[in-house]
């Protein structure tokens, strides 16, 4: 096999496993932090002895002063970043600690960008548009899904246009990521299901991406295998530590894969559902994934056949196309087994919005690495199939 040149980005330091949270204080010290802005949401902050309380304990034990911003919303908004930036500046913070899933991590990255770059955040949408270093970011992760703790992506919603935009830059990479599966124990089944399908979407889209390489393929394949074997158990019994740990590892691998291979039409389309309808990102991905997979199947049937086998399907004796079809069946069955809604019509989506969402999806940065190039009519048709 002939390899083209490729690069591979990951955060500087990653800690994984039970009680990994215990390193957060010392790691902030090593980053030179004196006063941290802890970015989270009100729900996480309210949990007694939860991830926020544990993070605060270890930060204070290390002598790090802390200011808290808990105004992060799902599908974080540019207004959340503005409010968090005000706290960052008022409290004269020099390091950002994000605690939660993708929303706090992306909001924290946005605060870092706004603190070091002039003008509206939207003007930095795109790839490698940032010119200045951000404050150090230490990302404490509590969900197995978005993997924002290990990626260069910052996804925010423009509240005026209701469009999600993505700022992709190596400068967004957290200096430290912490994945402690003990912080994921007891998360609600619906959240576990949605974030788990987000992780699966990351792995599948990275694997079939035009920008995939041998290293991203290896990470994506193992992520798909782990998710197929553990997501049902994590949803059924939230206290199953082995399933939680395997899902956390799968999410980490999927994040490292798409951080380098990029994504595709599932995410480009899901961002429109999140922007217009504030739909949970994992749910949007889960509903769209089988339909986009069917559209992409002819672009790389061999890899879809691999996905089928990784998900436990018996493809012995089948043609490549028949084996590839089994991947779509396996994805759909997993989604149904864990209680994900199967149709956009059940989630309040309006058919009249499909042409606009299709137009905007093709402008989304994730669209450019999709293995099959589509047009607005084809993307609108995929929305209708998912409806």
Language-model region placement:
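Short, amphipathic C-terminal "tail helix"
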Residues: 350-387
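Carboxylate- and glycine-rich phosphate/diphosphate-binding segment that chelates Mg2+/Mn2+
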Residues: 153-261
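Flexible, glycine/charged-enriched surface loops at secondary-structure junctions
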Residues: 210-219, 234-246, 261-266, 318-324, ...
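Glycine-rich phosphate/pyrophosphate-binding beta-alpha loops
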Residues: 145, 252-285, 364-368
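ATP/NTP phosphate-donor binding region
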Residues: 1-95, 344
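Gly/Pro-rich interdomain helix-loop hinge
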Residues: 276-353
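Glycine/threonine-rich beta-strand-loop-alpha-helix active-site module
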Residues: 79-182
